[in-house]
Amino acid sequence: MSGEKKAKGWRFYGLVGFGAIALLSAGVWALQYAGSGPEKTLSPLVVHNNLQIDLNEPDLFLDSDSLSQLPKDLLTIPFLHDVLSEDFVFYYQNHADRLGIEGSIRRIVYEHDLTLKDKLFSSLLDQPAQAALWHDKQGHLSHYMVLIQRSGLSKLLEPLLFAATSDSQLSKTEISSIKINSETVPVYQLRYNGNNALMFATYQDKMLVFSSTDMLFKDDQQDTEATAIAGDLLSGKKRWQASFGLEERTAEKTPVRQRIVVSARWLGFGYQRLMPSFAGVRFEMGNDGWHSFVALNDESASVDASFDFTPVWNSMPAGASFCVAVPYSHGIAEEMLSHISQENDKLNGALDGAAGLCWYEDSKLQTPLFVGQFDGTAEQAQLPGKLFTQNIGAHESKAPEGVLPVSQTQQGEAQIWRREVSSRYGQYPKAQAAQPDQLMSDYFFRVSLAMQNKTLLFSLDDTLVNNALQTLNKTRPAMVDVIPTDGIVPLYINPQGIAKLLRNETLTSLPKNLEPVFYNAAQTLLMPKLDALSQQPRYVMKLAQMEPGAAWQWLPITWQPL
């Protein structure tokens, strides 16, 4: 590979990072596996604590030669270096939590006249470490455990732990000590930045840092299993690697300096049950740069899933900013529909193949176009319209029936259902509605559903549905014209389109006359980043083969420039 091509390849590994941000902002990753439900979903998490998280199953796992070097290593990706710049590193070096912890340790060292390094905390972060993070109820990765390894760690920390007997910020907790073999390991608490605190325990050359005592408690009792997991981590057992199907990083294997693994349980953003095939993604940095992988679950999670995404790309109008195509399994969507309709059993087997979502620069973040495959009988073909009528809409108290009517039309071979729905975030002003006096908001969406032959189309933006119908009728170009036909392509990213979409959304949400401070901040800080983003080339993610087998199959990803 030439230096130029290699640089281009590395450049796009960074698009994965931006892709994650764009997905989470807009709900793009509505595609991964489930924790519970019908028989084709995965087994549920095992909860052993008050936080309702499974300590064996992190949402995000880091395995690093040096946590403090991770931000700098990420910037070796040309894309991230161009878009994020050195500000990204400075942000983490000067984060309030980091500065608060360092300040607390320095005060303890000074007041207790300890012979410890002034940069103790920084030196700990510069050691080999593993970090596991879990999301809270808001979806933020606020719960964590960090396992740090350093030669002579216990001896190094002895003076600091001795100070815990008489310090206002550092103290031994009332948590029952962690048992490792015949030894008892106490748990300490360090308070910083006022009411913030972290817990830690040390054993031989390892330190386990965690965010809350609730990680080890269930109700008001310390949980035996959760405490045992903490003990296993301190004693060297590889619980987290095993849960992601990862081999241990060893000197004999290809060196990996940084490893980031993200579970679909977090990336799914609440929609995992529809797409149980995907397990997660992984990014690794070795001597030759960054590499990326996608993981599949075992075949029992989606026996009949289809990885043929050609029908999706044939139906999607060209010009998309961001697209994702995913398989789905029979039975899961139908089971979820049972909560809103008594006729869900009539849909069995009708939802078929693969589905896709695309965002367009002239639309909105909250109005992607959905394309699915429907292979049902003539009777079943009426069910999507019934479900649309029953479940799509807003309460319009001024409307005679409490909701605006659905219009059903025939356009060639397509059946189309539309309903105007009030929303403060709507695309159209009230004056453009068919019955503006019945709307409860000054804006509205013209939500649309269409079915033509075996293709199902849905969007809050009726223009996108109209464009897709034109694509099906061969009067508008399709995404298949730009998507490579060799290999499996589940992801398409157009940085220029993404930049325009995000720019429009930002300026719409921050009117200059109403939000002058945030508007100026966006102009100064965000717009230059979007300008840099728009200069990046388009890429697709390609997979050579995608057949479910054993759990956590890791398949290499190829990023192909267009």
UniProtKB/Swiss-Prot annotation:
It comes from the Bacteria. It holds the Pfam family DUF2138. One of its GO terms (cellular component) is cytosol. InterPro entries: DUF2138. This is Uncharacterized protein YfaA. The gene is yfaA.
